[in-house]
């Protein structure tokens, strides 16, 4: 719970920024591994925007959250999958975080490593943001069309800048 509360401050900051601009978001996309960032951010945003659609984003091969939401219970990933999104590759959603997210999140989507690299390149080219792979999955979900953002006010959480030099170089070569 302290981790969820701490990560919820991101949601508080987003809510404050939206309210200052008289903006009501339609949906929020956030990366998820164990589920703490998604849970904390979702609690805070849902407090202010009760109609907000909340979507979790994960790397392909590590879509345990999306499958757990569909199954109505925690499920695990098969062993052997690989991803550049090392910060969020978890075997199973956390017990406490899954309970929170199950109540607040509508669904999850999975993105490929190539889509993540494209999102990292986009974040750099458009905003000069150095995003680590796991922190770029929500942006990848939007850019790839796996989450429809057309005519929808969408909050996209991009977090973390701990990226290996060679992976960031791979992303920048896509520009």
Name each region found by the language model:
Residues 1-175:
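PLP-dependent amino-acid enzyme catalytic core
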